[in-house]
Amino acid sequence: MMHLLIRSARIFTLVLLSSAFALGQQAPSSNASQSPATQVQTAAPPTGFSSSTAANPQSNNGLAQPGFLTPIYGLQGVLAETLDGATVAAQSIDEKFNPASSIKLATTLVALQSFGPEHRFLTSVWVTGTIDRTNGTLTGDLIVTGRDPSFHYEHAVLLARELNQLGIRTVNGNLIVAPGFTMNFDWSAKHSGEEFLNTFDAARRSGNATRAWIDERTLVSDNESLRSVPSVVITGQVQIGSAPTGAIPLLTHKSSKLVDVLKVLLCYSNNFMAERIGESLGGPQAVRAVLVDKLKINPDEILMSSTSGLGVNRFTPRAMMKILRALRDELQKNRLSLSDILPVAGIDPGTLEDRYTDPLERGSVIAKTGTLVRTDGGASSLVGQMKTKSGRVVLFVILNQRGNVVHFRQNQDGIVTAIQNSLGGPAPFDYLPIRLSMRLADSDKEAARARGEYEPRNQ
């Protein structure tokens, strides 16, 4: 079955993303404290917003807006608000829950604030020694540095092509990769370096890497690159280290824009990419510090042990709502919207692909999911926005734990649907989908030679 899924380069990349998502949802059990103590109770569905059913934001325990909530076994926190801040539903909003992968919204917010949506991750190639262009040989080492969380097969082949255009086809030396370099979602710099070396050499290149290269070049209509087979043979070994003194920068590869990397990350809830970006921000405690400082979130409302949502983390629904609103504001400052980074239910591939798929619901929910099957006895979340036929957009946070995650998801969908129906029913957001493979095949991502810093010279 896998060979069918990876018949195209981009499909292969997205399969990796999906696989990482599926594996990442499992986490070790934890008996951590700070678990909420409220259990959901039975309530009848509402007919709409009225004075008799208006939420009471002061009632944080129990059902402040009972009509939107249905019976469920487990713990639940809910906060739904209109854009102007009116409370639609509130339950246990100051209790702490495990948000699972919804914590990626916090990582995303701080990344956008720190780097900006146009930011590109750089992967640089350095060399030592001399180049003999008469026989295409570099006598010296090739060094690769960078922390691009989206670096894959096709990017390595692209760099091989650029070296070929500089007259290099053989490296009589070692491949040195920086400790922070990773490729194909592999945390090990050593393994990533070995994959890079094999992908560089056409004779050792895997079928997956070959398809990745062909499909991406086809996707961006770069037929010229397909007329030859890029290849660089490295005769030495893979070593881990920094660029040595005297190394000369030769090429720099630019990733897709951060906003496009985030869209893929969040659609597939890719834990590896979230942790890599989190590392570049200083780790979970650095992200938490920004939330406390800039968003004025009470430090007692958030506990972060990861930037992906793996493990034991704690957020209150109130804190998560502040993050969601800040994320919308940050995007709007850059003329973007939540649909530019989050999955649109029933349309985008990934975690919301099979939810809200009814023709009347499709495209009416934009949200981040979260799932941990074992941690905290099972944790599930849904955080985002919904649109209704009344024209209202409602922001919502639903956090569940200590129960069956499948039932939690069904309950979350029921809450969203009930709120939408109370406002005339669901309505789709304006959204023009772009294939995720195209987002990662940004044509501006070409390797650029370092002008004025290196001139090939004969040995």
PLM-predicted stretches and their roles:
Residues 10-20:
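Bacterial N-terminal signal peptides
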Residues 27-96, 159-165:
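Beta-lactamase-like hydrolase cores
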Residues 45-53, 90-99, 141-151, 246-252, ...:
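Second-shell loop/turn segments in exported
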Residues 88-90, 281-459:
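Small-residue-rich helix-loop
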Residues 99-117, 175, 265, 396:
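Active-site SXXK
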Residues 113-128, 334-339:
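Short, well-structured active-site flanking segments
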Residues 121-195:
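Active-site-adjacent, His/Asp/Glu-enriched structural segments that form or flank metal-binding
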Residues 181, 188-341:
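A small/polar active-site loop signature that marks catalytic segments
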